[in-house]
Amino acid sequence: VGSEMCMRDRIGPPLLGGETAEHPGPMAPDEYDVVGAATGVVEADRMLGAEKVRAGDVLVALGASGLHSNGYSLVRRVVADAGWGLERTVPELGRTLGEELLEPTRLYTRVCLAMLETLSSPAAPGPVHALSHITGGGLAANVARVLPAGLIADVDRSSWTVPPVFSTVRELGSVPWEDLEGTLNLGVGMVAVVEPGVVDAVLRVAEGSEIPAWVLGEVHDAGK
C-alpha cells in the first residue's frame, strides 16, 4: 500500500528497508503501520562514515537499556513456545517479563551530539570517525557497515556482561548464540569509532550523559 501511494503521488523515492518492516504476530496480513522520518543536512566535511575510519581507531560502546525494539519476533516466539505470560516475575530480571520487554529504548542523540560538539572544531576534521547504531542484525553486522574495505573490528567480548534478558531468551528457547548475536544487541546500543587519543574524553561525555560506556575493541587491518 505504501509503495503504491508513493507511485500514485509521484513522490519519487521508493519505500524500502525498515520503512516496510514486517511484524509477524501482532499485525494481520491486511494491516500496516505508518511511520515518520526526518532528514537533515550536514556539510560534506562534517560527515561521519567508513571513509574516515582508520586502523588503530578505538570502538567505544554505549550501553543499551534492553531489547531496543529489535528482535521481538524471535522473543515472542520463544516466550509463546515456553508458555510464559507477560505477568510472570522472572528473578533474574528482578521484575515481570512484560516490564522487561517494554523497557523504553535508550536514545543516543544527545550524547552523540555532545561528543561531536566537545571534540570537534570547525577548522579540522573531528576525531569521532563513525557511529554505528546497533539495531536489527546485531553488533557484528551493524559495526561492519561503518568499516571500509580492508579493515575489521576486533571486539573484546570480555569487556562487558551481557544483560540477563538476553541470557533468559537464549536459555528459555535454546537459541544458539549465533542466532542471538545476529538478531539482538546483547547490551550494546551504539558504537562510536574514534581516534585513540580521545577515548577518555568520549567516556567522560557518556558519563556526563549518565550512559554506561566502555572500550569495546579496536579497528585493525584485515590481513593482521
Model-predicted regions and their roles:
Residues 55-100:
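Acidic, glycine-rich loop-and-beta core segments that form the ion-binding/anion-interacting portion
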Residues 1-3, 7-14, 27-32, 91-101, ...:
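Glycine-/charge-enriched secondary-structure boundary and capping motifs
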Residues 1-73, 218:
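Glycine-rich anion-binding loops of enzyme active sites
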